[in-house]
Amino acid sequence: MAPLHFTILILFSFVIVVSSSSFTPPRHPFDPLTETELKLVRTIINKSYPVGPNHKFTFQYVGLNEPNKSLVLSWYSSPNHTIKPPPRQAFVIARDNGKTREIVLDFSSRAIVSDKIHVGNGYPMLSNDEQEASTELVVKFKPFIDSVAKRGLNVSEIVFTTSTIGWYGETKAEAERVIRLMPFYLDGTVNMYLRPIEGMTIIVNLDEMKVSEFKDRSVVTMPIANGTEYRISKLNPPFGPTLHNAVLLQPDGPGFKVDGHIVRWANWEFHISFDVRAGIVISLASLFDTDVNKYRQVLYKGHLSEMFIPYMDPSDDWYFITYLDCGDFGCGQCAVSLQPYTDCPAGAVFMDGIFAGQDGTPAKIPKVMCIFEKYAGDIMWRHTEAEIPNLEITEVRPDVSLVARIVTTVGNYDYIVDYEFKPSGSIKMGVGLTGVLEVKPVEYIHTSEIKLGEDIHGTIVADNTVGVNHDHFVTFRLHLDIDGTENSFVRNELVTTRSPKSVNTPRKTYWTTKPKTAKTEAEARVKLGLKAEELVVVNPNRKTKHGNEVGYRLLHGSAAGPLLAQDDFPQIRAAFTNYNVWITPYNRSEVWAGGLYADRSQGDDTLAVWSQRNRKIEKEDIVMWYTVGFHHVPSQEDYPTMPTLSGGFELRPTNFFERNPVLKTKPVKVTTARKCTPKND
């Protein structure tokens, strides 16, 4: 167990970069596919499906095929991992001449072991290459060029973003694999999203790579470029507010160690990897218990499963904007390189992300993940005792946590996703929303100009600019193993109770707890905020010395849920947001809450559908699904860029330990450098 390094000193700064391509051969069953393995996948598949003028074959997803859990745990629990690890395989989703093909490839035999055609609804996530190709196609399309000229605009100043179009009752045959291109105008700004060119419909068929529909419906006045700049080098005084420079350093070095993809810090050990769809994946998170002198299981696997982003404008230019970001675009594929000292503090360790491009060639996102210790001035625990005569006692421990971070930029929004581990045993998942609003042009510059009864579907945030109302629903898949694989879900209701007449008390009421163990999936669906209850995953086979079942409690954040009608097409596809919390029995194929094929899906392969089987979940290997929700009514402070809006939740040990696990954490040793005394004004 790595000790906590609490000595703090301001000295110098450093960052460490660990390249994923160096992890060859993999030493862990959950290690992401290496560059060498991705090249092997490409070689083997290209031999089976030769690409030519009449045979179009593209890689849409390549990732680690989920290994058998029992084999993983046997390997993990063996002394020094001496048992042979599970077979290492790749899972590939490809487009093959207009069909979606699912391929499993085994690395030891260097052979394809499974190959089938997907016959259901929906399409795989878009590749970067085909999105770029679609934009290059449109700028050469004469009807589009003519429409641009009609508006008096310069084609060279136009940029595009691509949008999936969802599903609105079309049959499978009608629901072609198409995207809609949304044009924006630069001409004096780089903040493209604040200058939309509306009134045009541009649809591109991705399989045929041609413009399948083009309409120029109307000419809409664009917002001006003035006031949209956000680059500090281009902004003019006055600046502010002024923040003083600071560097936090540990003279003993970081308190965590990264060995391949294994991270060890304080009393935690976990595996971290990168997936092109999920982003960060945390696996086999275990907590060292000094009372029993061993690591205890907490989280088998946790990651982002899906994001649902519906906008609240039913007009032709907006109704289709109901993204399923991870399934449509890939939350890992859209992840960006993190900036040392700003995205991540000094002392951070950075890791690259490797994934397969459309032709199967490995691509790399440098510094896509970072790991760092967080000193935020929080207090781990404290107490001042002044009630004892002639004695005053004060004990304080500053809090430190370990954060694994990724930032995924899906179009205009930047999502900061944090997995934060605390010495107390808690795991906090945080989501920060920042970036640029998606806006629409209007004729108004003041609210007094809005016609009586007119709904502008948002807020006037600048001249001729409305920030459109929308939601963000961020769903996490949390495969918990609380001290083992046999877990249950307990809904511990807090009930107001009348004081019994037999008790001599002036109190009329109090609250007490009424725990109920969910036996099936239906009993575990939770809409937060309807009643007071604690939600706990327990291991009924493990109890403390006082008889309490060991467990982890969900400390939820916002109770925001969907406001769309249940029969609205976007909500049918995103029915996994109907409840804030779901519990399902572990099924290796149930990974993506919005379905394996999200693009143009019809809602028939989602968490909501799987859960209709109402399977047994008591004393089973179970998975918790939790959705962080935001209703976003834009404000002027969100323009031209948006200050980070944060949400999240916490998994907190509940009777997991016999006592406070950080009781014996020693006070920090603080070393100060020069000029650390505040200046009095």
From Swiss-Prot:
State the reactions this protein catalyses: a primary methyl amine + O2 + H2O = an aldehyde + H2O2 + NH4(+)
Q: What does the entry list as the binding residues for Mn(2+)? A: D481, D621, I622
Q: Which InterPro entries match?
A: Cu_Am_Ox_Cu-bd, Cu_amine_oxidase, Cu_amine_oxidase_C, Cu_amine_oxidase_C_sf, Cu_amine_oxidase_N-reg, Cu_amine_oxidase_N2, Cu_amine_oxidase_N3
UniProt modification remark:
Topaquinone (TPQ) is generated by copper-dependent autoxidation of a specific tyrosyl residue.
Q: Which PROSITE patterns would you find in this protein's record?
A: COPPER_AMINE_OXID_2 (PS01165)
- Which conditions up-regulate this protein? Induced transiently by auxin (IAA). Induced by jasmonic acid (MeJA). Accumulates during dehydration recovery and treatment with putrescine (Put). Repressed by abscisic acid (ABA) and salicylic acid (SA). Triggered by wounding.
Stated name of the protein: Amine oxidase [copper-containing] alpha 3, peroxisomal
Gene symbol here is CuAOalpha3
